[in-house]
Every structure is written in structure tokens, then in C-alpha cells.
């Protein structure tokens, strides 16, 4: 099977890049022929790809000459709102190649409202029609399937989560009595991630031995807003702003923490939760994320991201013993082994592609 993935960029920090890159890597390992088309294949900090994955520019794809030498079975488009992705969709339709479209959480109500005036125009010009024309819409959670249905899409949908590699269990010793509870956030430093609520929760935790480490790139100048608020509240010493980390450096961050937080106002999936659980670290996620299973499997907390509720929950967590946290982490690792490996994700995506081809859906 020859599969063409189309995505604006493959920057390491983006969840869309992780999914596209790891699915591509997994597919070529399974013997599939995979090409990824991006706006700029020479951009810095691209997600690492298997050498068998061909990386090209989108502009080079949208030509008749390219198609005559590359007879793709499926075009898999990642993300929304870009005229470039619209052109790729139109190109696939003109050449009768079925499209699988991953919405990657961008149809979430919060996301649809954010900069709505720009999206309103794009929605009615091309995006709604493009999604209706997709052979299959790919969602990573049941919640995302629901979002897409509420927007009126009756296309077949497949639910395939983001995956994770099962990591070696941390060799770092557990927190000793009297040591600070080390709480890690990994992701973009951006308003939707809910970090301002964490800073304000810290104001209610001044009598708790707790340290927050924030790992990820600043976006839209939000980091300076968080730092200023932490200083205003007198909690600056409770925060480490570490900037982006990748590869081994990021693995060390997970190893050193006691738990992960995902306090977002909206989250299609939240791959960092899986990354933490795979390392036997429990996680706290907001009820705006699809992580109720943390409570169901007793490997974390699923709570409101209001500062008061966060503070209340952190006080309870800080009172837990190292053994109790370790037991939660081990249950989380077992959950990942059952449900969230990249091998399982890639197998599910192949089944999705095959369903398109076997039923002649265009």
C-alpha cells in the first residue's frame, strides 16, 4: 500500500507531528510505502523519521508529473484551517484518491471558538466541504468523534488513539519523606493549557512542599504572563521554567518527576499523559480532557482545573506516601501496555486504510 501523509509541518513539539511521524515510521516497518509532504521539508527541529519514509514538499506533490510516478492508494491529511491542506484535498479528489482526514482535536468547541472569525471564513469557503468529502475521518478519542458528529459529519469515523513507546521504568529513587513533590508539565506554554490556573493554585499551596517544573516552548508570549503572575502572588520559587526539551533530555525530566499534570481547557488527547504512565508516573488531568480513565484505573486524578480544586487535589497528593504514588504509576504502565502502544496504533490505522480500499470509498 502506498500512503501519502500531508501535514503543514513536522516540528517536534507538536502532537500532530508526533502522530504523523510515528505512524509513518510504524507503517514502513510493517512494509508499507510512505511519503510525508510538508510545506518546508528543510525546516529545523523536524520530528525524527525512519530513513525509509520519503519527505517531500507539498508543492512538489501537487503536480501531474508527481502523480504519474507515485500511484498513491490513500492520502492522509493532518489538521485543519490551511488553504494548503485544502489544495491537497482537492488534488486527491481530482485524481480519485480517497482521503483519510485526522482532525487532531481542532473541532473541539474551545478550538472552534478561538479566533472564530478566521475559522468561520475558512469553514464556509472550504473546510466543511473538504471534511464531508473525506472517505474516513480519524479521531483519537470518543469525545472527538462526538465533536465531529455534532458538526454534522456523517462520514465513517475511526477512533485510534495516540500511542507511546513503553519506556524503561525510572531508575530515579522515589521521593523521600520531607522532599518536595515534583510535578511536571510538558507541552506548549499557551493559555489553553491551563497553566495560569496552576500558578493561582500555587498561591493556595504555600504551606505545601511542592515544586512545579514547566517544560515546553513559549507561544504568544504567555510565559512572561505566567512569570509575572507567579511573582505577583509570591510563588515564583515554586516554579522552574525549563523551556523545550527533546529526546534524552525530555526522558530525564519524566524520570525525575513524581507525577505529570495536564490542566488544559481543551485537549483532544494529551499524549504526555501516556508518556508519563508508560514510565510508571501517575498523572493529573483536567475534566476538559478525555482522561476519566485515570480515575477508573486508579492511576491518576481527573479533576476540574479551577485553582481551588487543583490546590485541594495537590494537598491530598502531597500527603500520599512514595509507595502509594508508585503503585498508581505501576497501574498506569499496565494501562499503556494494554491500550496505547504505537504498534497497536499503526495496526489500527492500516485497518482503517484497508476499509477505505476494500469498500471503494472515495
Language-model segments: residues:
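Aromatic "clamp/platform" in nucleotide-sugar-dependent glycosyltransferases that forms part
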Residues: 265
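Membrane-proximal helix-turn-helix segments that form the acceptor-binding/catalytic region
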Residues: 94, 119-136
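Glycosyltransferase donor-sugar binding loop
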Residues: 36-43, 186, 211-227, 243-244
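A short, active-site helix/loop in glycosyltransferases that binds the activated sugar's phosphate group
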Residues: 130-156, 164-166
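Conserved acidic donor-binding segment of nucleotide-sugar-dependent glycosyltransferases
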Residues: 301-308, 316-322
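Short hydrophobic beta-strand element within catalytic cores of glycosyltransferases
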Residues: 282-286
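A conserved mid-protein helix/loop that constitutes part of the nucleotide-sugar donor-binding site
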Residues: 17-22, 181, 185-204, 224-225
Amino acid at each position: 500500500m502506498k500512503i501519502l501523509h500531508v501535514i503543514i509541518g513536522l516540528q517536534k513539539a507538536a502532537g500532530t507531528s508526533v502522530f504523523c511521524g510515528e505512524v509513518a515510521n510504524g507503517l514502513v516497518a510493517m512494509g508499507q510505502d510512505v511519503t510525508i509532504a510538508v510545506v518546508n521539508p528543510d525546516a529545523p527541529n523536524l520530528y525524527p523519521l525512519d530513513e525509509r519514509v520519503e519527505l517531500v514538499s507539498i508543492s512538489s506533490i501537487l503536480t501531474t508529473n508527481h502523480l504519474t510516478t507515485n500511484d498513491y492508494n490513500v492520502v492522509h491529511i493532518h489538521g485543519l484551517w490551511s488553504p494548503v491542506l485544502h489544495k491537497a484535498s482537492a488534488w486527491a479528489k481530482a485524481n480519485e484518491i480517497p482521503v483519510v482526514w485526522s482532525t487532531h482535536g481542532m473541532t473541539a468547541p474551545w478550538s472552534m471558538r478561538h479566533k472564530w472569525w478566521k475559522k468561520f471564513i475558512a469553514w464556509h469557503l472550504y473546510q466543511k466541504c473538504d471534511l464531508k468529502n473525506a472517505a474516513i475521518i480519524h479521531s483519537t478519542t470518543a469525545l472527538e468523534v462526538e465533536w465531529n458528529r455534532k458538526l454534522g459529519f456523517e462520514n465513517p469515523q475511526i477512533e485510534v488513539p495516540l500511542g507511546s513507546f513503553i519506556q524503561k521504568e525510572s531508575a530515579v529513587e522515589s521521593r523521600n519523606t520531607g522532599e518536595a513533590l515534583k510535578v511536571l508539565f510538558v507541552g506548549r506554554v499557551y493559555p489553553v493549557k491551563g497553566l495560569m490556573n496552576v500558578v493561582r493554585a500555587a498561591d493556595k499551596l504555600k504551606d505545601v512542599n511542592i515544586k512545579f517544573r514547566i517544560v515546553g516552548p513559549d507561544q504568544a508570549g504567555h510565559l512572561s504572563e505566567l512569570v509575572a503572575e507567579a511573582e505577583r502572588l509570591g510563588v515564583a520559587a515554586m516554579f522552574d521554567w525549563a523551556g523545550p526539551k527533546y529526546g534524552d533530555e525530555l526522558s530525564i525530566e519524566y524520570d525525575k518527576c513524581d507525577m505529570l499534570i495536564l490542566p488544559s481547557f481543551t485537549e483532544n488527547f494529551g499524549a504526555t499523559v501516556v508518556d508519563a504512565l508508560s514510565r510508571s508516573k501517575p498523572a493529573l488531568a483536567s475534566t476538559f480532557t478525555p482522561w476519566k480513565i485515570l480515575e477508573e484505573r486508579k492511576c491518576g486524578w481527573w479533576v476540574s482545573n479551577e485553582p481551588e480544586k487543583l490546590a485541594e487535589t495537590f494537598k491530598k497528593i502531597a500527603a500520599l506516601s512514595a509507595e502509594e504514588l508508585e503503585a498508581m504509576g505501576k497501574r498506569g504502565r499496565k494501562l499503556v501496555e494494554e491500550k496505547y502502544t504505537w504498534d497497536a496504533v499503526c495496526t489500527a490505522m492500516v485497518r482503517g486504510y484497508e476499509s477505505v480500499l476494500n469498500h471503494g470509498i472515495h
